[in-house]
Amino acid sequence: MPCRTRKRLNHVIPVFAEWDATYFLTICCIPRGMNTLCRTERAIEIFQSVQFYESLGKWSVRVMLLMPDHLHALVDFPFWGDMSRIVGDWKRYLNNQLEIRLQPNFFDHRLRRDESHDEKWKYVKMNPVRAGLVKNAEDWPYVYQSPGTR
């Protein structure tokens, strides 16, 4: 299936945005429609790279859910962090070290103060259920949850 060309998004965090905002990210694999991410060893490697970036202070991933050909995450970036660069560097690592090909761009949405992190996470964790991969969201094994996140 050919890869759709999408409009390039500007991932610069606006100056008026709260420095402690949480971002909802979606990153898609190339090609779509194949199980690239949902294998136990692969998921472990991805989640280890998430933890490594956390240890460097580049981001704090509240939760990440892997689907076969894309991932969703709720992420906090440091006030000095360049989201586009941080995500781009991580995607390059996944490509170069784990041979995971990802689309050049990604989707991000800054959660406003009135948006509930819990509501967004409840929606995301139902993805495997909606896709018919599991009957119960709690049965999906490809989830990373940062310590201290409920």
Regions found by a protein language model. Give the residues of each.
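Short catalytic/metal-binding and nucleic-acid-binding patches
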Residues: 1-150
